[in-house]
Amino acid sequence: MKKLLLLLLIIPMVSFGQTKEELELCLAMQSSNFMTDSEAENALDKILNNIGASKNFVLTPCSEINNAAATSYKGIRYILYDKEFMQLINSRTNNWSSLAILAHEVGHHINGHSVDILLYAADVVETKSLENKRKQELEADEFAGFVMARLGASLNNALAFTEVLLKVI
């Protein structure tokens, strides 16, 4: 289990590459009736039930971001995910991969990393430094490693996932 946590701490998982404009556009184009995927909801519930946390954010698909992201918009916290990206990752590895990605994004919310995207767009909040971004990614990775270990993921599950993720991203 310690090796799994260490591996997940060393290899950055997700959250590279989304610009605030892409995320804002995705959220703005969604209606207030978010449609989600039951498989993603079930995976998220599995993560939250395992750590005893309540769901205080919205899980919503957001096509063409080729990733997943934790953010907030107009005071509501979201986890956005690209269904095709998640399917691609899972097709090349296993179900642990989507759990790890979602756990990483939950980690951003749990650790207080998500700031309202409108504040960034309006330049009310200063963009984080590279050092701060890396620190936050490691904190989210640590949380994901903790969750995955509690759910019973093996070191081989983590290795398979990280090998594919590095090729895809």
What are these regions (language model features)?
Residues 18-169:
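A Zn2+-metalloprotease active-site environment signal
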